[in-house]
Amino acid sequence: MITIVDYDCGNVNAIINAFKELGVNAEVSKSINDIDNASKLILPGVGSYDYAMKRLFKSGLIDSLNNSVLKKKIPILGICVGMQILGNKSDEG
């Protein structure tokens, strides 16, 4: 299942609507279990790098995302600031 990670910092509705238009099944989730069991992940984001990182850490999903992507090699697509936070650091505030 494609899982769109909801960490309260993204354009989740736009993404799910695009998948519906394409006839692709995807779920929106804040659940560690769903992230751990996803076949692919989408990490949306709107706003600044710092704000997105704060929301991601506050969500409690960072360890699950790291495990899924870095250890299990689950493909991830970052959109907008969701792509930026896949990096180690940013000069953006």
Model-derived features: positions:
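Short acidic/histidine-rich motifs immediately flanking catalytic phosphotransfer sites
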Residues: 35-45
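Short acidic low-complexity segments
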Residues: 26-37
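Cysteine-nucleophile active-site neighborhood
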Residues: 47-93
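Short gly/ser/thr-rich secondary-structure transition/capping motifs
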Residues: 21-28, 59-60
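Structural signature of beta-strand start/N-cap positions in the alpha/beta core
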Residues: 25, 40, 75-77
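N-terminal beta1-alpha1 ligand-phosphate binding loop
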Residues: 2-24
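Short alpha-helical
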Residues: 10, 33, 47
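Residues at the C-terminal ends
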Residues: 21, 37, 70-71
